[in-house]
């Protein structure tokens, strides 16, 4: 047990220590300063020339958003065509068939919004061609989209008064070539050394210890897993994600993959401080996020290492903790750490089954996604926190009788309305979706039965499964309580709608707020200026997040996860 705890501590220390220099590097990349990766400039110039794009052309916030939305629409259409027709495309040695229209709709939107919700099993639901030219492609593009949006916001906030927020295409390419690609190559090499397969052979025929014949999928796993983790994507190459021994072969590989989930979201908080030359503000934001993350880690590690009371009642020893749904080679503590790491971000990959974690662990996993501001997805996680900064600044200003200001710009009714809509949309789409599913399950049993029954675990846990699904979609996370039968017409389409709303409405709102603030007259700091880089303001922001985001969900948790915990 002590060794497992030391492993958890070592992983967290590595994340914290390495996120600082990475954040400094990312800030330099977006500011156009000299870095070690400048050797990529010729490649970038060729890409821009072939695309007919001038990377130095400035965009206002509306042009920036137009480019972002148009390119995502194009990739959605691209993905839909390939997923439906994958059965007749090359690189399909196992003969996997094309996806149905509603499954392709869900899959394509899911990967386009950086969620990677999977209503299919990775090795049988896709071909090598679509793994590379839809899944891996989207995992780079969507991660870079979030990072580009944050870069635009940073540029807007760094300027005293400006009409433009940078060039979306430039930020998109820089995010891929300077950050995501180099880190993916390093992580991919480590995984190959640890035993993750990399090739295009078909299924491998093996004889098990019992003498039976089994066919094991292989493919370009080591190419896809790194960006799956680093881009907070999370979509597993194999159906059981990183609990699969070929996707996550060893404890060291597990450490590297877990580190990969959080390193860029952590670094982005530091990058904000370096970009704006307000390191203290970056430290403050990072500190609040880290505190919330560590609280979750402590709760889940304690819950999972403590074992299941029901098994204790049977007189069965649980020296290794609650091991249902976990891998022996990884242990309960490493699985608990991963469960929090993957849900404080929009990653959603798993190295054990969240459906089998203890009820309070499941509640923490859902609360992380329901709050959706602790580190979050690459770029968009900080942007969600930015929404609550605007709300906290406005409330704080009213409380002390000062005009609300953030970084020298007045926060007025227009920005507050946008921030409020963004903040309230998240709980709204989660709770409405869950309520609709619960209503249909009770009042339309014939429809539910025609779709396979949906729930394998009715009662408290069944409600938790439906709540988790919509929570994961709205937070663009992608993990799930897999007792839910979700590859159906209803779940594919309803989740697809929640995915779109949960991704693009916040991005549009947050970029709009930054663009509107940037155009306002700059107000120099004075003795009456609200200091946003203090511990006091950090606590205020934490309180606003907890009240607005977390408390909205406690009634439904009382009927699901908490009720299940009390029934043990």
Swiss-Prot record:
Domain of life: Bacteria
InterPro entries: KdpA (IPR004623)
Compartments where located: Cell inner membrane
Topology in the lipid bilayer: Multi-pass membrane protein
Main localization, broad class: membrane
GO cellular component: plasma membrane
Sequence intervals crossing the membrane: 3-23, 68-88, 133-153, 180-200, 256-276, 281-301, 375-395, 421-441, 497-517, 535-555
GO molecular function: P-type potassium transmembrane transporter activity; potassium ion binding
Keyword annotations of the record: Cell inner membrane, Cell membrane, Ion transport, Membrane, Potassium, Potassium transport, Transmembrane, Transmembrane helix, Transport
Pfam families from the UniProt entry: KdpA
UniProt subunit comment: The system is composed of three essential subunits: KdpA, KdpB and KdpC.
Family: Belongs to the KdpA family.
Reported function: Part of the high-affinity ATP-driven potassium transport (or Kdp) system, which catalyzes the hydrolysis of ATP coupled with the electrogenic transport of potassium into the cytoplasm. This subunit binds the periplasmic potassium ions and delivers the ions to the membrane domain of KdpB through an intramembrane tunnel.
Name of protein: Potassium-transporting ATPase potassium-binding subunit
Organism: Phocaeicola vulgatus (strain ATCC 8482 / DSM 1447 / JCM 5826 / CCUG 4940 / NBRC 14291 / NCTC 11154) (Bacteroides vulgatus)
Lineage of the species this protein comes from: Bacteria, Pseudomonadati, Bacteroidota, Bacteroidia, Bacteroidales
């Amino acid at each position: 047990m002590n060794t497992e705890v030391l492993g958890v501590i070592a992983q967290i220390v590595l994340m914290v220590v390495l996120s600082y220099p990475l954040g400094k590097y990312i800030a330099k990349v977006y500011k156009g300063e000299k870095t070690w990766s400048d050797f990529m400039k010729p490649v970038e110039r060729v890409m821009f020339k072939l695309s007919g794009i001038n990377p130095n052309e400035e965009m206002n916030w509306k042009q920036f958003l137009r480019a972002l939305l148009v390119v995502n629409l194009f990739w959605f259409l691209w993905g839909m065509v390939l997923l439906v027709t994958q059965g007749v495309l090359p690189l399909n040695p196992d003969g996997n068939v094309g996806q149905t229209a509603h499954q392709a709709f869900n899959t394509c939107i899911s990967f386009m919004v950086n969620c990677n919700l999977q209503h299919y099993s990775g090795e049988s639901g896709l071909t090598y061609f679509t793994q590379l030219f839809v899944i891996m492609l989207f995992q780079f593009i969507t991660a870079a989209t979030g990072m580009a949006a944050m870069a635009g916001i940073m540029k807007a906030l760094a300027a005293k008064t400006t009409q433009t927020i940078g060039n979306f295409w430039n930020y998109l390419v820089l995010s891929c070539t300077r950050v995501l690609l180099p880190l993916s190559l390093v992580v991919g090499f480590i995984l190959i050394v640890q035993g993750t397969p990399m090739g295009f052979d078909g299924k491998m025929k093996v004889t098990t210890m019992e003498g039976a014949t089994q066919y094991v999928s292989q493919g370009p796993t080591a190419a896809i897993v790194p960006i799956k983790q680093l881009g907070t994507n999370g979509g597993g190459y194999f159906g059981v994600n990183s609990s699969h021994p070929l996707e996550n072969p060893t404890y060291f590989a597990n450490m590297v993959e877990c580190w990969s989930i959080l390193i860029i979201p952590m670094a982005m908080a530091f990058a904000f401080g370096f970009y704006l030359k307000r390191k203290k503000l970056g430290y403050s934001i990072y500190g609040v996020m880290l505190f919330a993350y560590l609280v979750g880690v402590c709760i889940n590690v304690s819950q999972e290492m403590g074992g299941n009371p029901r098994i204790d009642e049977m007189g069965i020893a649980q020296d290794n903790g609650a091991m249902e749904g976990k891998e022996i080679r990884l242990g309960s503590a490493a699985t608990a750490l991963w469960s929090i790491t993957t849900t404080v971000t929009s990653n959603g990959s798993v190295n054990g089954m969240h459906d089998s974690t203890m009820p309070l662990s499941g509640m923490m996993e859902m609360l992380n996604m329901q709050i959706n501001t602790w580190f979050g997805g690459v770029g968009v996680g900080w942007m969600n926190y930015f929404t609550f900064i605007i709300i906290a600044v406005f409330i704080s200003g009213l409380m002390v009788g000062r005009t609300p200001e953030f970084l020298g710009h007045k926060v007025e009714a227009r920005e507050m309305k946008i921030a409020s809509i963004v903040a309230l949309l998240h709980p709204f789409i989660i709770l409405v979706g869950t309520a609709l599913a619960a209503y249909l399950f009770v009042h339309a049993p014939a429809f539910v039965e025609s779709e396979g029954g949906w729930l394998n675990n009715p009662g408290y846990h069944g409600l938790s499964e439906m709540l988790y699904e919509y929570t994961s979609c709205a937070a663009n996370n992608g993990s799930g309580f897999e007792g839910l039968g979700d590859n159906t017409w209803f779940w594919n389409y309803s989740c697809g709608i929640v995915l779109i709303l949960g991704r693009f409405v916040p991005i549009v709102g947050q970029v709009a707020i930054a663009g509107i603030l940037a155009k306002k007259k700059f107000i120099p700091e004075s003795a009456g200026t609200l200091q946003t880089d203090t511990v006091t303001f950090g606590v205020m922001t934490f309180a606003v997040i907890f009240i607005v985001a977390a408390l909205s969900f406690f009634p439904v948790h009382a009927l699901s996860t908490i009720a299940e915990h009390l029934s043990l």
